[in-house]
């Protein structure tokens, strides 16, 4: 009986997860939070938006903005940026915390920032030499990945 219960529970949770997994929908940029729109107009004014997508998971909602040049931005529900991926250009300098810029200038002089993301615990940047640097909340380097 116990075995049957766990098998049933596993099947139900798998089907629920699968049903909730694809809750992405294209939305107009006007439906983005106001601070997200301000961020885009400040740092990416010259780029044309290809599409905006609202991504809903079981416990969170994110927004993804994709520009025609391939640049991708991801924002949290509250409109704060989560990830910036500028694979064909570079992340605007004003977005990168000064301590991270200083570290990269000192150790990787001519490299550009292609990507940056952050969460509660750390910042991760990807440089044009393909190195990925991880910094803690106090901007101390904690990992280098090639």
Feature annotation, model-predicted:
Residues 1-24, 40:
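Bacterial Sec-dependent N-terminal signal peptides
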Residues 22-146:
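Interaction-mediating elements
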